[in-house]
Amino acid sequence: MAKKSSIEKNNRRKKMAKNAAPKRERLKAIIADRSKPMEERFAATLKLAEMPRNSSITRVRNRCELTGRARAVYRKNKLSRIAIRDLGSRGLVPGLVKSSW
């Protein structure tokens, strides 16, 4: 089980990234638009740099919904490999069977 503080920090980052996404997109569009004057694009770059780092979606980590584990998390299930294995061995994941050959 991951530390509660790590899980909460990631949740705060998710919320902050979601709230700041439209503003970041507007600023990035201004920066990428070559028809705008250089001063306006540079001002947009400075505004983007002033925004909190945690407002970037890149800072959000995929975590397991059950354990909070940050590594080996399957995006489709939002579960770590360990959690899937545990649930699968208990027969709680439909269609998941232990392989044998």
From Swiss-Prot:
GO CC annotations on file: cytoplasm; small ribosomal subunit
Highest taxon of source: Bacteria
Keyword set, alphabetical order: Ribonucleoprotein, Ribosomal protein, RNA-binding, rRNA-binding
Pfam families named among the record's database cross-references: Ribosomal_S14
Residue stretches of biased makeup (Basic and acidic residues): 1-10
Biological function: Binds 16S rRNA, required for the assembly of 30S particles and may also be responsible for determining the conformation of the 16S rRNA at the A site.
PANTHER family given in the database record: 30S RIBOSOMAL PROTEIN S14 (PTHR19836), SMALL RIBOSOMAL SUBUNIT PROTEIN US14M (PTHR19836:SF19)
Quaternary organization: Part of the 30S ribosomal subunit. Contacts proteins S3 and S10.
Entry similarity comment: Belongs to the universal ribosomal protein uS14 family.
Protein name from the UniProt record: Small ribosomal subunit protein uS14
Organism: Rhodopseudomonas palustris (strain BisA53)
